[in-house]
Amino acid sequence: MIVVLIGALSIDIIFGEPKEYIHPVVFSGRVASAIEGYFRKFDNRFRAGILFSIAVIVLTAIPYFLAVYLSSFILVVYVVVSMVILKTTFSITSMGEHIKLITDSLKKGNIMEARMHLSMIVRRDTSRLNENEISSAAIESIAEGLVDGYITPLFFFVFFGLPGAFIARIINTLDSMYGYKDRKNFEFGRFSAFMDTVINYIPARISWFFITFSSDILNYRSKAIPVRRYIRRFDSVNAGWPIASMASALNLRLEKKGHYIVNDDGYQPGVADIEKSMKIYYLAAYSYIVIFVLPLLVIMAVFL
């Protein structure tokens, strides 16, 4: 498992995201779109949503784990296939690529372009956001992305192997597609949102340590705000942990209008703060491997 993990990390660093036609996030989205109409015909939308979520996970998993099974007869091929599939469950490099598009646009003074790039990674309406609000949304996305796009899948990889990481990633995809509180998805997507809350519960709290640790190493943290004070302002029981931790790390006022404000007296965020938050993100990501993931994999390899 350690070799598979190191290989997957190397693929991310060297090659970045795989092509869409082999990416499970893209494939699961296509599967969901293809079968969604059938399940929406049921009167009980909540139960339909449960069956739908299970169906998407199973149908998405079949070709990937069939590939793992078929490759298992040749060890080298099996390891390489496992590396590639594990890589598809998490991402480090792509976050930096998305964020760079936003910061480059802001540096050029092109607010419209920055809004457009931001809209690719957030759910909120970006059409009227100013530079500070764009910066806040980007930093919040970096903080949340550390959890659901990285810490969570590798957390489940440690304890449940490749299937755990893979399923965690598909659950996150389902939540991003259907975990809304609008009329269309409130009942239908409730199970997807619930599963996402469950799998991110521990990783979100782990993120507090790694964001704080990384900001201290980088000598960024100038104000320690009580994270617990702000997590209750979020609808999600998980989102507040990484976002409030990042606000504390950089002493920033992070705000989603009409929803929450974190660190009311903090500085208004700007482009430089987005770049600092990315440095925290990278250091937190790699320190998580060194401090948490690898030691646990070694312990489990020796004693289990």
Swiss-Prot record:
Highest taxon, organism lineage: Archaea
Alphabetized HAMAP family for the sequence: CobD_CbiB
Lineage per the UniProt record: Archaea, Methanobacteriati, Thermoplasmatota, Thermoplasmata, Thermoplasmatales
Pathway: Cofactor biosynthesis; adenosylcobalamin biosynthesis
Role of this protein: Converts cobyric acid to cobinamide by the addition of aminopropanol on the F carboxylic group.
Subcellular location: Cell membrane
Record PANTHER family: COBALAMIN BIOSYNTHESIS PROTEIN CBIB
Pfam family, one: CobD_Cbib
GO biological process: cobalamin biosynthetic process
Sorted UniProt keywords: Cell membrane, Cobalamin biosynthesis, Membrane, Transmembrane, Transmembrane helix
Species, as recorded: Thermoplasma volcanium (strain ATCC 51530 / DSM 4299 / JCM 9571 / NBRC 15438 / GSS1)
Keyword Metal-binding annotated: no
GO cellular component assignments: plasma membrane
Positions of transmembrane segments: 2-22, 50-70, 73-93, 147-167, 284-304
Family: Belongs to the CobD/CbiB family.
MF (Gene Ontology): ABC-type vitamin B12 transporter activity; threonine-phosphate decarboxylase activity
Protein's UniProt name: Probable cobalamin biosynthesis protein CobD
Transmembrane as UniProt keyword: yes
InterPro entries: Cobalamin_biosynth_CobD/CbiB
Primary location class: membrane
Membrane topology, as annotated: Multi-pass membrane protein
